[in-house]
Each structure stands twice: as structure tokens, then as C-alpha cells.
Regions:
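Elongated, amphipathic alpha-helical interaction scaffolds
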Residues: 1-182
Length: 182
């Protein structure tokens, strides 16, 4: 029993179980989102913890860690990523395409049949990575779609992907986000 207690004491936020337990605390989840996005959130609803999505029988299914919606109907998917996986066949890192797939599947349940597309709520897919995928040293990498011919022109689809880098060395993050990393 002592080994089990020692093993449990050594778990960190990087552990799937601990991450879900911590993020299931409403106050902590709200605070993390507020600090990261520099917004005020009054309340959140947990839509599902570890939601499994399999859009078609032959499609690749996924399991989303934490999905919440705030009081303005903005939807957030929070993921802890401890491995910088590569496709064994192509040797390419999978994180960029994984974020794209997660964003698409997050949207899949947000519209009912015959609802107009403009009713899609804003969404954030947030990957908390214990590695610096881009090797640039940023604490935060935020992505939105931009026009290549006019980089000032952003596609207003309200879909944002954020990759947090716990190994970051520069950029503006709050002390609370930094302590969350530690």
C-alpha cells in the first residue's frame, strides 16, 4: 500500500487522471481560461470529460479530454499532451494535423439539423504540451486562419487553436499560468 501512496504522490498535472481531476474543478478551469485568454468568464458548464467521438464507422475516433462551454456559449477543448508523437510511416509529427482534426470534431455536435452556420459558437482547442513543438521558446502559440495575400485579413470563423509550451522561456504569460506549468 505504501508503494501505491508513493506512486500517487509523484503524479503531476501531466498525468491523465490528475489533469482531468484538476480541470474538473470549475474554479481552476475558469481561472486557467481567463488567465490564458485575458477574458472574464462568469461560469462554465462541463459538456463532457473524455468525450469519445467517432463520426463514422470507418472514421478515426478521438477522445477529447475536457470540453466546457462558458456563459457566452464559447466552447473549449483542453488537452494535455506529454508526447511529441510522429507517424511511424511518414516520420512527421502529428500535432498540427491532430489539432485540425480535434477542431473539426469539436464543431460536429454544435449545430442541429437545419441550423445556419453562423450559429456555430466560438471554439478554442488548447493543447498543453510538455515540449516546445516549434522550438521557438514561446510559452504560447496562438493560431487563427489568415489570408496569405493579406496577412492583416483574418477569416472570422471564430476557431482558435492554442498550443501552450510548458518549456517556454519567453512571451507574456501570467504568474498563475507559469505556476500551472511548473
Amino acid at each position: 500500500m505504501k508503494n501505491l501512496a508513493t506512486k500517487f504522490e509523484n503524479l503531476t498535472i501531466q498525468n491523465d487522471f490528475i489533469f482531468k481531476k484538476v480541470m474538473s474543478r470549475k474554479r481552476i478551469c475558469i481561472h486557467l481560461l481567463e488567465e490564458l485568454l485575458q477574458i472574464k468568464i462568469t461560469d462554465i458548464n462541463y459538456l463532457e470529460a473524455e468525450k469519445s467521438l467517432e463520426p463514422e464507422y470507418t472514421s478515426r475516433g478521438i477522445r477529447l479530454d475536457i470540453i466546457v462551454a462558458d456563459d457566452r456559449n464559447t466552447h473549449y477543448n483542453l488537452e494535455m499532451q506529454v508526447k511529441n508523437n510522429k507517424n511511424p510511416d511518414t516520420k512527421k509529427h502529428v500535432l498540427p494535423k491532430r489539432t485540425r482534426y480535434y477542431q473539426a470534431l469539436l464543431d460536429i455536435d454544435l449545430l442541429q439539423n437545419s441550423q445556419e452556420y453562423d450559429l456555430l459558437p466560438p471554439t478554442y482547442v488548447i493543447f498543453i504540451c510538455v515540449f516546445d513543438f516549434f522550438a521557438k521558446g514561446n510559452y504560447v502559440y496562438t493560431f487563427k486562419k489568415r489570408c496569405l495575400e493579406d496577412l492583416e485579413l483574418e477569416l472570422p470563423d471564430e476557431a482558435t487553436t492554442i498550443i501552450l509550451n510548458t518549456q517556454g522561456t519567453h512571451g507574456n504569460i501570467s504568474k498563475d499560468i507559469k505556476s500551472f506549468y511548473d
